[in-house]
A protein has these predicted regions:
Chain B
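Nucleotide-state-sensitive switch-loop elements of NTP-binding domains
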Residues: 33-66, 74, 83-170, 181-183, ...
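Hydrophobic positions on the alpha1 helix immediately C-terminal to the Walker A/P-loop
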Residues: 79
C-alpha cells in the first residue's frame, strides 16, 4: 500500500497549489498513472477517497485518471506493440518472450481544477 | 543543502520538488469561479530528487550503496551476517536496516561488529529516500560509521512497494529464496525490471522444493535482459564466492571512480 504515501505527497502538492492560487476548494484532479509505474489504480483511488474526505480543501473532489500507453518493442523481430493494458506475454508476430518497454513508468499530476 | 551536515540533500523543510507550474493555460469557466491549472509534475519527483542527493552524498564519502529488496524471510539478514564475516578486515561495511517494527535485525548485525542503524517505518511498507537520508546521517555517527566502503540498505520485506522508490543506491539487488517458488519474477515484475542483480537464496533447500532455477532466472531475464543473476546458500556457503567477488568488484570500481 505505498499508494497511500504517494497520495499523501499528492495532497501536500495540492495544498501548495491551492495556496499559490488563492483557492479554497479543489474540484477536480487529473492524474496520469503509467501501467509500469508500480501503482495500483484502485488502491490509489481508494487512498485518495480516504484522504480527501478528511481534508476540507479536497472533500468531494473528483479524481480523473489517465492511463498512458506503453510501447513494447520485440527484441526478436522488432515488432512494436502499443498498449495501455497488461504487459503482453510474448510478441504476437514471432512469439519472442523478451519485449523492451518504453514509457508508462511515471505517476504524474496533470491538471487541477480549483476555486 | 542538508541542515545536518551540509551534504547535497535538500533540507527536510525545503520545497524540493520542482513542479513546473504552467499558469499560462489557466482559465475561468463560464459558470463559476473555478480555475484549471496544468501542473504536469511527477509524484516521484520529490523522492527522486532526494535519492539523487543521497547518491551524491554516498559518492562524496566513497561508499557503494546496495538496496536489498525481497519478501520477508528470504534471508537478507543472514546473507549480510555471512557477508560481513567473509569480508571483515578487507572492506568496511555499514548497514541500514529497514523494518516496520523492532530492532532485531540491527542487533544481529551489530553483533558482527559493524556500524548499523535500524529504521522502523511504523507501518510503511517501504523505505524512501528521505528515510534513507536520515538513516545515513545516523549511521555516520555510529562508531566506524564515518568510513564506509560498502553500504547495505536492507529494505522492508516486501517485493512490491520498495521497487517504486529510488533510495540513491548504486545497485539494487532483488532476492528470492527457494521456498518462495520460481514464479516471483513473473508475478512481481517491477522488482526485477528495476534491479541490477537477482539473487536466488537458500539453494541448500533445492532438494526439498520444486524450484527450477533456470525457469526463475529465465523469467527474470526476459523482463530485464541486463540483470546479473546468482544463486547461493548462506547456510552452506555454496555460491558465496560469486557474490563476494561481485561486491569486491563494486568496491574496487568505486575506488577507481568507475561507479557513479
Amino acid at each position: 500500500m505505498h499508494e497511500i504515501s504517494l497520495v499523501q505527497n499528492l495532497v501536500q502538492q495540492l495544498k501548495e497549489l491551492a495556496a499559490e492560487n488563492q483557492a479554497t476548494k479543489i474540484l477536480r484532479v487529473t492524474m496520469e498513472i503509467g501501467p509500469l509505474c508500480g501503482v495500483v489504480v484502485d488502491s490509489f483511488r481508494f487512498g485518495f477517497d480516504i484522504i480527501s474526505s478528511e481534508e476540507e480543501l479536497l472533500r468531494g473532489a473528483e479524481l480523473l485518471i489517465d492511463i498512458p500507453t506503453v510501447r513494447y518493442t520485440c527484441t526478436g523481430c522488432g515488432k512494436v506493440i502499443v498498449t495501455a493494458g497488461p504487459r503482453p506475454d510474448c510478441c504476437p508476430a514471432c512469439q519472442e518472450l523478451t519485449l523492451f518497454p518504453e514509457g508508462g513508468d511515471d505517476l504524474i499530476l496533470l491538471q487541477v481544477e480549483m476555486e | 543543502m542538508c541542515d545536518t551536515c551540509g551534504c547535497p540533500s535538500p533540507s527536510d523543510h525545503s520545497h524540493d520538488h520542482d513542479h513546473d507550474h504552467r499558469h499560462d493555460h489557466s482559465h475561468k469557466s463560464g459558470h463559476s469561479h473555478s480555475k484549471t491549472v496544468d501542473v504536469h509534475a511527477s509524484l516521484f519527483a520529490a523522492n527522486d530528487a532526494l535519492a539523487k542527493a543521497n547518491r551524491e552524498h554516498f559518492n562524496e564519502v566513497g561508499a557503494v550503496a546496495l538496496n536489498l529488496i525481497s519478501s520477508p524471510g528470504s534471508g537478507k539478514t543472514t546473507l549480510l551476517e555471512q557477508t560481513i564475516d567473509a569480508l571483515k578486515g578487507e572492506i568496511r561495511i555499514g548497514v541500514i536496516e529497514g523494518d516496520i517494527e523492532t530492532e532485531r535485525d540491527a542487533l544481529r548485525i551489530r553483533a558482527k561488529g559493524v556500524p548499523v542503524i535500524q529504521l522502523t517505518t511504523g507501518g510503511a511498507c517501504h523505505l524512501d529516500a528521505a528515510m534513507t537520508h536520515k538513516g545515513f546521517h545516523r549511521l555516520q555517527k555510529e562508531p566506524g560509521g564515518e568510513n564506509i566502503d560498502l553500504l547495505f540498505i536492507e529494505n522492508v520485506g516486501n517485493l512490491v512497494c520498495p521497487a517504486t522508490f529510488d533510495l540513491g543506491e548504486h545497485e539494487r539487488v532483488v532476492l528470492v529464496s527457494v521456498p518462495e517458488g520460481p514464479d516471483k519474477p513473473a508475478k512481481y515484475p517491477k522488482a526485477f525490471t528495476s534491479s541490477h542483480t537477482f539473487l536466488v537464496t537458500k539453494t541448500d533447500l533445492l532438494p526439498y522444493f520444486d524450484f527450477p532455477v533456470p525457469e526463475a532466472v529465465g523469467d527474470a531475464l526476459r523482463l530485464n535482459p541486463q540483470l546479473r543473476t546468482m544463486s547461493l546458500s548462506s547456510k552452506t556457503g555454496d555460491g558465496m564466492e560469486t557474490w563476494l567477488k561481485y561486491l569486491r568488484e563494486l568496491v574496487a570500481n568505486k575506488k577507481a571512480g568507475k561507479l557513479k
